[in-house]
Design a protein with these regions (language model features):
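Outer-membrane beta-barrel transmembrane domain signature
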Residues: 123-173
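Residues that define the transmembrane beta-barrel architecture of outer-membrane proteins
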Residues: 27-29, 61-63, 103-107, 137-143
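Residues on the lipid-exposed face of transmembrane beta-strands in outer-membrane beta-barrel proteins
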Residues: 33-37, 67-71, 109-115, 128, ...
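Membrane-embedded beta-strand positions of outer-membrane beta-barrel proteins
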Residues: 47, 80-82, 111, 124-126, ...
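Start-of-domain marker
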Residues: 23-90
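Short loop/turn motifs that connect adjacent beta-strands in outer-membrane beta-barrel proteins
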Residues: 25, 41-42, 74-77, 116-121, ...
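Bacterial Sec-dependent N-terminal signal peptides
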Residues: 1-27
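Transmembrane beta-strands of outer-membrane beta-barrel pores
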Residues: 49-55, 84-90, 115-117, 128-132, ...
Length: 173
């Protein structure tokens, strides 16, 4: 088991290392805060702030503010949510130093479900977004999958160090 885990981590490291050299953009960063506050056993309040920069710091690319209310269908496993997001984007025009800014408003609905198989914890998120852009309206469907494996514990409890792999698929209409 330990040999298999070691091989897995080495493979992830090698794939990540090769992908690092494939990037063509400069240094940037992405600060994020995620909060989930229980209102009672059935209801929760979700909030999120993401601040993204070009050129390491001070050159804003995007500010995302998202909040929502969730209802637990089952304890710690299945949650339905409804929410709103405000996004301010500052994108560079291709081949120039000029930026164009715009605001986007999103209403979203999502279903979150969690599963565990021994020490492997999976999370699936299905989200539908109604996107209100300047002079346009679009729909987007998203599927997010994360896999977490605790390293120093058998469960994902407080102060647990864990490995995480995740990805998300976006389908724009």
């Amino acid at each position: 088991m330990k040999k298999g885990l070691f091989v897995f981590f080495v493979a992830v490291l090698l794939v990540s290392f090769s992908q690092t050299f494939a990037q063509k953009s400069g240094t940037g960063n992405w600060f994020a805060y995620f909060g989930n506050q229980a209102i009672n056993k059935k209801w929760n309040w979700w909030n999120e702030v993401q601040y993204r920069n070009y050129n390491f710091i001070g050159d804003r690319q995007q500010l995302l503010l998202r909040t929502g209310i969730g209802y637990n269908l089952t304890e710690n496993n299945n949650n339905l949510s409804l929410g709103y997001a405000f996004i301010n984007s500052q994108n560079y025009l291709p081949g120039t130093e000029d930026k164009i800014g715009f605001d986007e408003h999103r209403i979203y609905q999502q279903f979150l479900t969690r599963q565990n198989f021994g020490r492997v914890f999976l999370q699936h998120r299905y989200r539908i977004e109604e996107r209100f852009l300047p002079d346009d309206f679009k729909m987007r469907f998203r599927y997010f999958l994360s896999l977490n494996v605790p390293i120093n514990n058998k469960t994902l409890s407080a102060n647990t160090i864990y490995a995480s792999i995740y990805n998300e698929i976006f389908l724009n209409s």
